[in-house]
Design a protein with these regions (language model features):
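Secretory targeting signatures
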Residues: 1-35
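Activation on beta-sandwich/Ig-like modules and their edge loops
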Residues: 22-171
Length: 173
């Protein structure tokens, strides 16, 4: 009956809310949305072109396929001293062209000086091999937090772009 379903759904919602409140009482305090310094979140590394097994490539996402396009990744780094909740933030490539943005999952927290890696197979963000492209991260309100761009025809096999705190981008393999 419809009334029973409505009561059941309301109870489940309340239980999930209580579960979140209990979880948040652990030793690690998560910076709330209003208090976090979102400028501490940076795109620290991207891999555009994974090398195949024939060329000693790496299976970056451990899915059993070496050099597949699913091995492309974007790495986020929390350069700050407090954990930051990045739930509902948007990861994107070139906004005018390119892939649809990827909304980060609920309850996604990057620990202080911690990293998370988002692979193409889960984000559906396709970084371009031949044309210039960029990766960007925006907060839940759409404010651009950081980006990393690279030029056309510059992606080497199994070589990623790394950005340091000063914003300098270099290639590493």
């Amino acid at each position: 009956n419809g009334t029973t379903l409505a009561i059941l759904l309301s109870a489940l919602f309340l239980m999930s809310t209580l579960g979140t409140a209990i979880t948040m009482e652990e030793d690690t305090e998560i910076m709330p949305a209003a208090g976090r310094d979102s400028s501490d979140i940076r795109i620290s590394e991207i891999l555009v072109s994974a090398s195949s097994e024939d060329y000693n490539g790496t299976d970056w996402n451990n899915d059993g396929y070496t050099g597949s396009s699913s091995d492309q990744f974007i790495e986020l780094w929390n350069s700050g001293s407090e954990p930051i909740d990045v739930s509902n933030w948007l990861l994107d490539d070139s906004p005018e062209e390119g892939s649809a943005p990827c909304r980060l999952a609920w309850n996604t927290t990057i620990e202080a000086d911690g990293y998370i890696v988002i692979f193409r197979d889960s984000s559906r963000i396709e970084l371009d091999y031949f044309d210039p492209d960029s990766a960007s991260i925006s907060d839940a309100n759409g404010n651009l937090i950081d980006s990393l761009s690279y030029p056309a025809e510059d992606s080497w096999w199994d070589t990623s772009y790394v950005k340091d705190l000063s914003g300098t981008v270099t290639k590493v393999s």
